[in-house]
Amino acid sequence: MTPLEYIDRALALVAQRALALPGHDVFQHLTQQLQYVRAVLLDRGLDRSRLHQITIGSVAVKEFDETDPELARALKDAHYVAVQTGRGLKIDLP
């Protein structure tokens, strides 16, 4: 999978969970952050400074690690992509 595919997978899972639990604000927060990461991956000219403030990984662990491991894994992978992109490093995911 490409870095963009990891972000798209996380976005799809978040959208699916948001439909099942409408009104759960955490999904809106995650969607906004994932869309920003996606935009940065698609347009290298965008400001990357906000990538250092991404909280996708901590939300994954706090909110979903125990209750929804599939979503938690996708969010952790997306967080890794964001961090590595923000640092300008190569992204190595399985």
Predicted regions and their residues:
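Amphipathic alpha-helical interaction modules
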Residues: 15-62
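Short terminal alpha-helical segments
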Residues: 1-31, 82, 86
